[in-house]
Amino acid sequence: MQNLAPWESFFMFVNILLRDYEPVKRRQQGSESNEVMKYSFTVDTLICRELFRSILKEKTLGILGDYLNRECIFERTKKLVKLNYNDDEYDYDLDDILKIRKNSSGKLIVDDIDQAIFIIDHLSRKVDCKVFTKKSLVGFRHIEKTITEAGYKIRERRSIGLDWYTLLNDIRTSCAKHRTFVAFSKYRYVDFIAMLTAFHQVKAAKSNEEEHLSTIYSLYPFVEHNFDEDKEDAATTKQTTTTTTTTPQTRTRKRQATGDNTPTPTPAPAPKPTTPKPTPAPRKISSRKNGGLTNVRVDHISVNNIPTPSDTNESLSPPSTIISSSNSIKQCLVEVLESKGEISIDKIKSIFNCLQNKQYTGDLIDSMFQQNKSEKVITISSKLFNMSNKVDYDEINFAKLKDDILYLSRRLIYEKNTNLLIPTEEGEGIIGFLWLPVVNGALTASVYVSQLGADVDFKKISATVRFVQLCISMSDIIGFMELRSLSLDAFRSIANELLYMSDRILNLEADLRTLKDIVMKPTNLKKHVNVDNLFSRLSPEGSNGFANYLYDFISNHPYIKIDKSQNSIKLKETPNPVLVLTYDPKVVEHKVGFLFHCRSEISRFNAGGNKFILNNIQHSFTPNNIGVLSQDRENDLKRNYSMLTSNTSKLITGTGSGEHNLERFISITINNTAYDLIRVVLFRDISNGISISNLRDIFRENSDNRNRYLEYLGKSRLIRVFFIAPCLIQILEVNFAATQLTADKNFNRAIKSIKIRNLSYITIDIIVGGNVIDSIRGDATQVVQINASEFSFSVSCLKFSVSATLVSKKNLQNISTIVLNKYNEEKSYLQCVKKFSKLSKSFIRKFTGMNININALEELLLSEAGAYEDDDDDEGEGNEDDEDNDENEDEDEGEGEGDSSEDEDE
């Protein structure tokens, strides 16, 4: 999902298919058919099927046969066909299609081939959503066990699976060599179901406003989420950057001023390289019992204005100034995982839940620190946010430590279980800080407290987290050196040797095993092994003997790795979850327990001159508005929209704010995960629920099936998509945290709970923030507590993400004009592309003709040059004959000299 594109972009590929292939109607009126995926076809799907059919016929050298006919594909299982559809009568029971049977042990009984393929396809993609678009297709046996463990009892499971995978492999192999697919590498390895799904498109009945909004979001999937809601006045609008800690590449979204109608995203400029200044002699830095955290840079460090400690008080050490010769750190916001150690994310969330419910006591946050085995709190200056952001962590090489680095790193050692507290300077009377708990020498879930609406710079937070990981790594390296009694020079020597001795490590391990055998069975091996030589090789007197110890130390360390490609020992990019706690300072009448606990530490933050008025802060804190904005939840949202600034980031602008100026829409994002095609559907009124299905109204008026169809779907908002087998999923209720719109937009978007009904054989996993919070099996209706701004679930190759979007009423009045303008812009772009294509073809044609003329000219010149060389050869032979005659004439009285001269002149 890294390169999302509008669903319409797929039809550029469709147009190419239309030029080469014409549809052939295969199903005749009144004929019986057992084709796979019946009653799901559109004209585009039939075109795609004809393409595959023609390719398969080419592959089989003209052998006739409908390769998409059920009886042809599944010769061994055609007797299992349960339903015999008839095109004229449609004499089947809709209840029978959607009926789900279970055996005595609770397993789902599947004897319909379409449903069996549906289950196999869904479970295959559950592990890897792009499994069928890769160059090599895994075999069915790799997922057969998964099907059994998922609770399905499929008759002739192996026979169906093997035949289905054989068909997929035949289609992939044939298409990969076909001219239409070779030209488009993205579709070369065909995902049959995903391509049929893309052809079938996504259809939903919407009102005009809903249609226009859906079009905008679908055509521009990279648009900033909720780009069309009211912004503040341009003079007060701030540019914010929001990223998550879950992707290896920094993704940002920027809120730009609304005054300028031309979108001009401005990325943050990278700091220019600076020349390191001479480093003065290091002085002793005041610290706690085990040393305090100090800002360090591995390459160049300058320590300025570090006072000599006058007492043993645990005061905050003044920060050192980092002077880096590299560019800005290449930030990678790390992937959110469950917290390791003794503090879990669930524990933190439960405490935040207590704060939301006003269940706060003086020892509430104390319990969080007690979970960390330590009440020790280390405070660090807020300058660390800016200083750590200037460090290029990718350039750090632990194998080239300098003396001053070693001196400073000895002061990085602190207790294995401690709490780091770093304030943020957000203004007078506004409190914000980053809490980093360290458990057993490793970081666990971090907490960031910030005012509601304040800029949260996750890039700096990530840099700070990596800096603390660097500090932990440096401390552990010092501990390793002290344990082995190594000097810095010895450590450098061992580290540099380790980078080039992978074979050496293997030999050492083999020697250790041999030594163990000698000790255990001395009589058997001493005759064949030189024990003295072996012990000398394993002797710890030289640096070579410690290489295997260093290798084991690095292999088991959470933050250090060996990079053979760059011959260096580097800092890992280790996942560390960050939870964001926001509060509204304007609406509160209560005090919160954790401020009492942090009071003494917060009082240290006025060293830079910015004083925090603690009493005002305590009275202004809003426990009932505290929201847990977990980074893993934000990550799922950002994946859907990629959160990249686009040309529509300021497509709709407006002024003013307030709950009376906004409309709330439900946004359903449908993503074809195989090809990263996206369609967004927005609904305003969902009081009757939302139905997602491939069922179509093909029944006779007043028939039983027609009445049952209306009962199933009712008056719900229908989204029709392509599935390989009958499927109906209904979101019956969506309960928002705010029944009426408030001034808090985040609170307005929050979904409290949903009621979902699953009429399919597929188990629906409800995902919030990357975690499965609940599962709904087939033929079940269940209420799921969401408590987030978005949730998602997947069926086959489609991922459905449901969230809320706020749109201003003023902007809705102009939406039709905006859509029309955007369509006109797209037309102009397409015309430019066509003109460019014509110019390119004309250039290639003229260039080819010119090349032909050049080749002809070269041949002519070569032929002329060859003729000229032949004439020169003839003249040379004549000269040799003349010289022979001259020699003969010289023997006679020198007569004929004149003749010889004349010959030479000729």
Swiss-Prot record:
One Pfam family this sequence matches: Dicty_REP
UniProt KW keywords: Plasmid
Record field: compositional bias (Low complexity): 236-250
Polar residues: bias regions: 302-314
Lineage: superkingdom: Eukaryota
Region (Disordered): 231-322, 865-906
Protein name according to UniProt: Uncharacterized plasmid pDG1 103 kDa protein
Lineage of origin: Eukaryota, Amoebozoa, Evosea, Eumycetozoa, Dictyostelia
